[in-house]
Each structure stands twice: as C-alpha cells, then as structure tokens.
Amino acid sequence: MSVEIVPLPLRINENESFLSYDDRLNRVVFKTSSGFGVVLLDDPEANRRYYSSDKPIIDAKFSPDLKYSAIQFSDYDIEILHLENGTRYIQTCKYKSSKATILGYYWTTKENILLVTNASLELYAMGLDGSCKLVKESKIKITNCVYSFNCNFGVLFLHSGGTSIQPYFFRTNSFDKLPKFNIEGNGNGFNIKNLYVTKLHEKFFCVYGDQEYIYLYEMTLETIYKIKPIKILLSGPNSIHFVDNLIIVHSELNISIVYDLKTIQRDRERGQTNKKEPEFPISAIPMTLSTINSNNLLYLMNNATKTHSTTSTPIINSINNNNNNNNNPSSSSSPSSSNNSQSSSPTMISSYEQRQIDQHKEQQLQKPNVTLYSKNWRFICPNYIFDPDSGIWYEVTLNFEKISNFLQFDSHKTIPFLQERTLLSAKFALLSIIKTIIEFKTDTLDGIGKIYDDLNKVLFRTTNRQLTESLHKSINQPNNNNNNNNNNNNNNNNNTAQTLNSTGNLSNSISIGGMNTSTDNLTTTTTTSSSISSSPSNSFIGNSKTNVNNLSYLNYKKQQQQQMEKQQHMPNDDEDSFSLIGDGGSGGSGGSFYNTNTNTTSTTNTTTSPSGKSNSNLKLSQSLNNTPNQSPNSRSSLNNSSNNINNNNNNNNNNNNNNNNNNHVVQNRQSRSNQYILINSHDMYDFVFNPIYEKLLIESQKEKEKENDNNNNNTNNNTNNNNNNNIEELNSNEKLELDSKYLIAVVIQYIKSLSFNHCTGISDKLYNLLISLLIDNNMFSRLHQFLQYYVITDSLSIAYKLLSIGEQYPPVLQLSLDMFKRLSMPNIIIETLLERGQVIQAIRLLRSTKETNEQAYQELLTPTYPIQFLASSSNQSNDTLFFSVFKFFETNNLIIPSHPSFDKYIKLFIEKFTEKSLSPLLLDILSNLNNNSTSGGDITPKKNVGGSFLNQSLNNSSPTLRSSNSLNSSPRLQYSNN
C-alpha cells in the first residue's frame, strides 16, 4: 500500500492568490488584483467565476446554498452580497467600539453566519431583505479558532491560551457550549494549526498532532473521551491528512506514515503493542506521484484482468472449438463452452475506454518534474496539497495494491482492514487476497469459511438495513417533508434532546454494488460535564450507513441517479451521509461491476459464465455541483466580471466526455464520500472463482497438449520409457483433479456461508460454476443431492444447464423438468417431452395447464401449435397414438383445415382411419373449403374467445364428440398407456 498524489485540473495562476478551501462546498476561493473568484475543485475545465471589487479583500466565503457571499474588507465588518438580486448589506461586529477585531467568520447554516472576534461569538440570521439579525452571542476572550462543518453540524474550537480548548456546537439560530478539555503534550509548543476536526469510522474526533504523538479526542454532546495517543514512528515536524478513515502523517524526512485507529485498538486489546514503543503503522514509505488515479474504475478493471484476458482467451477458444468439432455431449458442462461468440476474458473494454487507458499510460511515462515534500507545500485538510510555486493542486489518495506486504499477509488483519475501507482499490485488493488464499491454499477450509462469514455478515446487515430503511422512507416520506419544513422555521431549545440527522447530499455510490442514503437518528442530551472518561459512549455523529439491495439492483441504481440529480439542483447544507459500496457489481459494486455508457467513467466486464451469460458491469457516475447563475447588479461594490458558469447536467457530461487528456479522472465529491465496500456473490464469481476455474481449464489443456506431444515423440522409444511417462502424466492429471475438487469444496463453503448468514440474491453464475465443476469430476450423485435438497436454487439458467446434460446423467433430466415446472415454464417441458417422443405426457401437461393456468394455456396456443404434436406422433409408427393425438386437438377445435400445415396430417388421418373417423364438424368445414375453392371464395380462420381457431364452437358439435373431451375416453389410448 502506498500514498499517492494525483494532480487535479485546477491551477492557480500567477495573478491569483489562494484564500481558502471550503470542504463543504468543495470550492476554492482565490483573490486577484481586481477582486476574487471561486472555482469548483472537481471541475475538469476549472471554470472560474470572478467578482470584481474596488477594495482590498481579506477573505471571502459562500453560503451552503450558494445564495450569499460574505466578503471581509476590514478587521471590523463584512459585506454580505445576495448573489441572485445583487443587494448587499454591511455587518459590523457588535463590540467594534471596544476595539474587537474579527478573527474569522463562518456560515454555520444556509441562513446563519458566525462572527468570531477576539472578544465574543456573534451568530446572525439572514433576513429576507438581506439584512442580518443578531440571534445569539457569547462574550469570551479568544486568541485563535478552528471551525469545521462535519455531518450536518458545525463545531468551533476556541483557543484562549495554554492548551485549553473550548468547543461549541452550532445548529440553526443557536449554539451550545460543549465540555472543555485540555490538549496533552508540550504546552509551550502548542500550535492551533495542528488541530484538526475529522470523522473516523463514523465517530467525530478532535485530532492534535505534535512532533512525537497524535492525540485523539472522541466528541459527543455529553462529554469528551480521551483516546490513548499514537506515538509517531518518526518524530519531528509533520503534517496530517485523513483519507479513507486513515491517518496519514507526512514527516519532514520525506516519509508518509499511515495509521489505522481500529487496527491499533485491536492490537492493544490483544496486547501486541508496547507502551514505550511507537505504534505499528500500516505503511511507512515515501509518497509517489501518479498521473493515474489508482481508484479509477477503468484503471482497476484493466489491471485486474489484463494478464488473465491475454492468456486465457485463445486457449479457452481452442477448447470450445475442440468440443464443437468433436460433438462431445459433455461440452455443455464447461462454462466457457456455453457461448462461443463471447470472450472468456472477464473484461471487454470498448475502443473509447481503451483510448482512455492508453492516454493514461502515455501520461504515466511523461510525469512532470515535481519536488515531493516541498517546504512550500500547503497541506489542506482533509486530503489536498497546494503547491504555491507551480499553482498545482494535488489530491492525496491511497493505492491498496500489495497491501499484504505491509501486514505480513495475515488474513485476520488484512481482510478486516480492507473491509473498513471505502476506496475502489481496496475492494480489488480484498478480492485479490481472497483469490490468492484459495489459489495457493494458504489457509484451511475452516479458515476460508471464517473469511466468508465475515464478508457475508456485513452483506446481510447492510442488505437487511436497506430493506428496512426503504420501507420506512416510503411510509414516512410525506410526514418527514412536513416535519423538516417546520423544523427549519423553529428554534431548538438548549435543554431539549438534539436529533442529529446523518444523511446528506454529498453521497454517491460505486457498486463493484451498492447505495441509497439512509437516516439513523441519534438522540442525545447536552450536559455541562467536563470530565474526560476512558471509554466512549454515544457517538457525536451517530450511525449512518447506506446499503445495497441485491434483489433489485437495477431499480436501485435508477433511484440513486434520480436522487443525485435532485441533490445537484437542490443543495442542502443540513445533510451528510455515510453510505456503503455494494452490489455491485458493482458493485457489487458492490457490488458487482456494471454497464458503461458514454456519460460515465466505467468499463464493461463481460465474462463467459457456465450458462453462457455475461457478467454484470459496474457503473461509476460523475457529476458536478451547481454554481450560482445570478450575478450582482452594478450598485454593489462587488461586480460580476465573468459569464455565468453553465453547470447543468448535460454540459457536465459533455465536459467529462470531451476531456480525455486530463491527467486526473476526477470523481465528484459525492463519489468520494464514505462508502464501505461490500463483497457479494457476483464479485466472488467474477474476480475469484471464475478466474481460478479458467486457470484450471488452461492447465488441463496444456496437459493434453503435452500428452499428445509425448505420444508423438515416444513412438520409437522402448516400453519402459513409455510406462514412466504414463506414470508421470497420471500423477499430473491426479494433481489437477485434486485442485478441481478443492475448488468445489471452496465454492460449496461459500454457498454454505451465504445460506447460514441469510444472504439473498445469490448469483446464478455461482451455481453454474458449481455444476460445471461437479460434471468435470463426474460427481453426478453429489449434483443430484444438491438439486434434490435445494442447495442449488431454481433459475432458468440452471434449468437449461441441467437440461443440456440430460444425456450424460439421465436422472438430472427429470430434476430439470421439475425445476421448469416450479418456474411456470410449461412450454419448455412440452418441447422437451416432444423431442423425446413422449407425446402422451406432453398432452397431459397441456391439458393440466389449461385447467390450472388458463392464461399460460392461451399463451401457448398458436395456429400451428398442434403441428409439433402431430409430427411427433406420426413419426413413431403408432397408429393408436396418432389417432389419439389427432382426436384430442380435433375435440378442442385446434385442427385448422384452412391452414396448409394441417393438410399433410388430415390426409394421413383419412388414409389410416377413413373420413368416417372425422368429426361431423370437421367434415363440414372440409366440404365448405372444397366448395369455396371451386367457387373462388376464401375462408380465413379466426380465433374465438375460447381459444379455438374455428368460427364454430364446440357447443355446435355432436354429443358424441362432446363426450370425448378426455384422452382417457379412448380405449386404445388407455391400452397404449399401459
């Protein structure tokens, strides 16, 4: 695992000066000689919006809804500009007369702005006319402050000297004082710039770093919990970043050290750490510069499958060709032989996507000359670096490739660590580690089963929570909308319980699977306790997760995209979310890995499954937040000197498509929100089981080629040498067979874990793979047991596959027909029975379908539907059978003399049984046809309400014909059945 910096499209020009970065809006504010400007950090075009000013600007900030802009011109007042109508209002701090100066100002909500002076805290509410009204103040001596908006609330840390910190919690039109605490360490060297506010593993932390330790304080509304400090591996000046719930310490020794709080706590509980020694980091190596984002989907998919796709395709295709040429009935048992037109490579990349990958490779070869760990770098929380010398912005990210090198390949450490990550590269690394464990047998079956249980327990909890929350939202959505509107207009009491809503507009999904936003409300009561406890209580941010519903992934993805579009047009500052990656593919992605279109950055993963169906694909959505469209009028001291930035969805998509030459494929803030990865059955098949199975096929093909070469080369050798070679070949074949059986045990263990953990939506491709493995090893009795006891669930692909191997193992044919019956597919059963000459059984099923499911019966009937029954019965040289079949369809008015296809069988019936055996109704129709043909008339058969293709009804037939409404009414048929 390594720390990487990736250059962003944004460049700060020479005539521009960086002012601040707004983490909530993901916007960079800068000033120029004539005013200031703002730019969206994720905009590939880096489109700027400029505002001119005739005064020198100290700082500028935008409201969360991008409706107002607050500009500081002096130490005593700020100017608030309405960006839609251009009105402005100057607000002066209350204690200006006592020489109070502004230390900072912040938008706590879209309607509240906070002024922090060296003498007081002043919270103002915005009026409809743009004026400010003081709603709450607190007189306190302040020397410095740090403000953070995280998880729908703001927290201000005030420093008044020494190491004492006073936090405040802000909500609409009010704020509360939280328990005061002291920062440990050297008080003389305390620097407020080393104080950070972040969220780690769903908990809210205040983090302070000095040259030797990292001090962490978990914050709740009740009190502050001190966490045991982390001793830094390399002491000295440093800077701290937070990426993917990890703490990255950039040392002045040009080393980036990565710490995971949960891993450290696990080691402490196990007693594996020494109090006097530094904490063991996840990695400690220099950061690297990369022009390719290691968490880009195209990059990951290409790296995950490039070796496999280049080696397996020709060999698998040769296996398919051999099977087809030899007409081997067992060829259907191979997953790769199910569809010869599809490639067996797990990835089929389009030309557009391949061009992107090629461009990234060229850019990787042409890295710019950048001095890493420059002294002029500005480290901006949470994970950005600004280089003032070049004006380049970098994003700090993680590449989880070769993570096992840093954790000594301990699956008990590596897999839980990767499960708690959110980046795409972590999901690919986790799948790669599981594949390595299985392929090289580095763990026992019981150990692998425990790994499966860990994965599937998380999958079940998230899926179950998703179903519950979806139902809750669908029921309470109207009521919640009304309650939210009322809550925004009312003030909250200080002594009442506070509800922290943890959903947000910065959420988005990536399923290699899965992700709707969810809301978990945490109710806590504020107290004045200032004690520091040793164990945590209620989290300051609560719990909020988003999950993937594996049962309805496509519908979920549509809802997610609609929700993203709404959030882009309706910014909401009161929300933030914690969601999970699942089915993912995409997924799973998720979950799984899902489809590509021209407006998204994604790739198509198409693998030949045992059923011949292609794998699902992952969709990675990208979009940009809206920027204000209205400019202020000329009456303001600030004039808009640029055209409006068009950030609608269509133009954003076009920008993404037309900017293939960018060094960095930018994900928007929504896609970089906290999203735990999920591993489902689709992911396990696509990236673990199926690659191993195809490798076994490749090895098997190589062994066959060696055997053929040995036979050709050893024709002139003596008998002893031939016997030795045969023994060696038998040993190699036995090894392959054992490996294949081991894979069977591994797959069965995974299916068992899915079942025991109540995971639904298991991939049919997984069952197809298991069936193929059992057939390859001639384990038909085991396959029979799995089908008989419903270990393998019903699906059309499974039923078709069982039907295809009926010749190899006849008992499975009946099991496949039973599965088709449970799936309500009588047409397939009837066709199968007719192909095998079992006409009577097919007619009985047709009659049973008519009695039990009239709709399915009507769907089966076509004008020529009886032809296949008549053809099958006439080819069996059984006159009694042909008579019974013909009479059945004649009785049900399904014989259509006017249709040319029936002429052959009507003539055959008359030849064998004479015209007297025909019903009077059919004789009348035939006579009418003959008369009309001689007179030039035409009769067109019409389908009546009862399903008959004759104009006449069965009620018009003779009583004798009506009485023969059953096959069993014919003595000859009863005799033939016996």
Curated annotation (Swiss-Prot):
Record keywords: Autophagy, Endosome, Lysosome, Membrane
Bias (Gly residues) occurs at 582-591
Q: Which residues form the Mic1 domain?
A: 735-908
One of its GO biological process terms is:
regulation of autophagy
Tell whether Membrane is among the UniProt keywords.
yes
Q: Where would you find this protein in the cell?
A: Lysosome membrane; Late endosome membrane
Q: Which Pfam families match?
A: RMC1_C, RMC1_N
Q: Does the keyword Cytoplasm apply?
A: no
The region called Disordered is annotated at 311-363, 474-546, 558-665, 703-727, 955-978
Annotated Gene Ontology cellular components are: late endosome membrane; lysosomal membrane; Mon1-Ccz1 complex
Chief subcellular location equals: membrane
Q: Where is this chain compositionally biased, Polar residues type?
A: 496-515
Look up the domain of life of the source. Eukaryota
| Ranges annotated as biased composition (Low complexity) | 311-351, 479-495, 516-539, 592-663, 710-727
Q: Please give the function described in this protein's UniProt entry.
A: May have a role in autophagy.
Q: Which family does the record assign?
A: Belongs to the RMC1 family.
| Protein name per UniProt | Regulator of MON1-CCZ1 complex homolog
Query: What is the source species?
Result: Dictyostelium discoideum
